A protein has these predicted regions:
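Domain-scale signature associated with acetyltransferase and cell-envelope carbohydrate enzymes
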Residues: 1-155, 160-161, 169-178, 182-213, ...
Length: 242
């Protein structure tokens, strides 16, 4: 009787934890979910060479998380969510690490980490939908930041430029995976300080370092730029009327 009651309790407990979700763990020691945390309408895969540690009172909702190699740590009261239940947010950790500090809300469409990349996001930071983080080296985002919609943060060229013969050879070998990368592209780390506001449709590209209390205006692109603290950055647009 006690065994049956315990099994029923466990079944109900995990159904609540993983409401409408598929969770596949290849490494039993590599997955921990804290008190009061839930995974809703999501898909999670943790490979043999990976780990996924979720703190207390976290919410993961409408997300697909695939961790092939590396570690993902979600601290207490953090939220990973998409407002689009059908088109879920994608978190792909092919090889690298991803750390979200406490009381942070991420609504990115995609986070993609490869080639041993590292992404760390501080506390009380919000990233809105449509945004994307790609790391093949290092992206460090501080605390109390507001990152708007459709913002791209890439520390990588994402692709290596080959001669046409080499790219054709790779395409044939790895078909149907077009654009397959066999070596790490050019990269340079990104740092965003604390209390920054990154405007809608901005692009923070490789090699950019942003200090504290910086505002980046709408549709601004930063590549290999150093922005000192307490600055305002806008894209220079020259309007011509012909």
């Amino acid at each position: 009787m006690i065994t049956r009651l315990w099994n029923k309790f466990s079944e109900t407990y995990w159904q609540y934890k993983f409401s409408g979700s598929n969770v596949r763990i290849s490494n039993s020691d590599g997955f921990v979910i804290g008190k009061g945390s839930t995974i809703q309408n999501s898909n999670v895969f943790v490979g043999r060479d990976a780990c996924f540690f979720i703190g207390a009172h976290c919410i993961l909702k409408n997300v697909d998380i695939y961790i092939e190699k590396g570690c993902v740590i979600i601290d207490d009261y953090a939220i990973l969510i998409s407002e689009k239940p059908i088109n879920k947010a994608m978190y792909i950790i092919s090889n690298g690490n991803f750390h979200v500090n406490h009381h942070t809300k991420i609504q990115c469409d995609r986070v993609w980490i490869r080639f041993g990349g590292n992404v760390e996001i501080g506390s009380y930071t919000n990233i809105n939908s449509g945004s994307e983080i790609r790391s093949d080296e290092s992206v460090i985002i501080g605390s109390y930041n507001q990152i708007s919609y459709d913002v791209n943060i890439w520390d990588t060229n994402t692709h290596t430029i080959y001669k046409s013969e080499k790219r054709s050879e790779i395409t044939r070998k790895y078909f149907p995976y077009f654009g397959y990368e066999i070596e790490k592209p050019l990269t340079s780390p990104i740092v965003v300080g604390d209390n920054c506001w990154i405007g809608e449709r901005s692009s923070i590209m490789k090699g950019t370092q942003i200090g504290d209390n910086v505002i980046v205006g709408y549709n601004t692109m930063l590549l290999n730029k150093i922005i000192e603290s307490n600055k305002r950055v806008v894209q220079d647009i020259n309007l011509r009327i012909l």
